[in-house]
């Protein structure tokens, strides 16, 4: 292993560890990480960022699929949506790419309001997105499975294919075609069927990355056996409806990230992107994190418990801001101190552990 390889490995380990901090303490994030790390073979954050760098070029579309509707208010949750908006900003900063949010119509006003906060113009016409600077797109996606099939084909046939598709905290149908919340309740009627589009793009060889924090999200079928064995409600006949399929999403992804909170997994990928490109501006500030969370909550997005107080998966704005700041500080230190500690690198590598 070279010094550079060790630096990259350790930054990935740091970011993976941060996104899997477990203040709640019941350990699901560690279970998922064990499976996703075994599948990936290296730090998840660095892997995803590296794949993006290898394929994304200036002007490329990148589809960001997100949006999970929760009971009892039938409102979109914060997790997934907040990081999707901040990821859109990062992709413009890193590549001058053209991000397109694909989500339930319920999320449209939040996307509109948050786009202003991150400094991007929002268009539904992708021709405008492609030709205009500092712009992003939105495509509201159908909740009807039959119409979703047609819409997915239409999106693929009528637009330039994206360089990548990234799903963040997006519900995925189980093997019976049903969508569930974390505790096994059926939410099929509420959810956009965006996993249909994700899978079609994957079949076409588009770079695909899926981020989840439980197993009911798009792409988590990649580690199906692991999730079915260890995650509650995931196995067959363990959900609370009559479908008998469990909450595990059947869809698979070539690259996955699992974390305590899906947004934290996305932030880890974004921080890794900033590190690999040696450009700290790619990663957002704690202040922008708080601003987007506030805009999202004022647009009707809820915490997982249904509250309109800004929070993501039960974690307050303060905790999310601290997470962003700590990830950012790790990356900044790594970039600013590259080339230092040469003696220690040489000595450590000489011992043969790495």
PLM feature segments, named:
Residues 7-8, 260-263, 280-354:
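C-terminal accessory domains and tails appended to enzymatic cores
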Residues 77-96:
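Histidine-anchored nucleotide/phosphate-binding helix
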Residues 73-76, 175-189:
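Glycine/threonine-rich flexible loop motifs
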Residues 1-61:
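Positively charged, low-complexity intrinsically disordered leader regions
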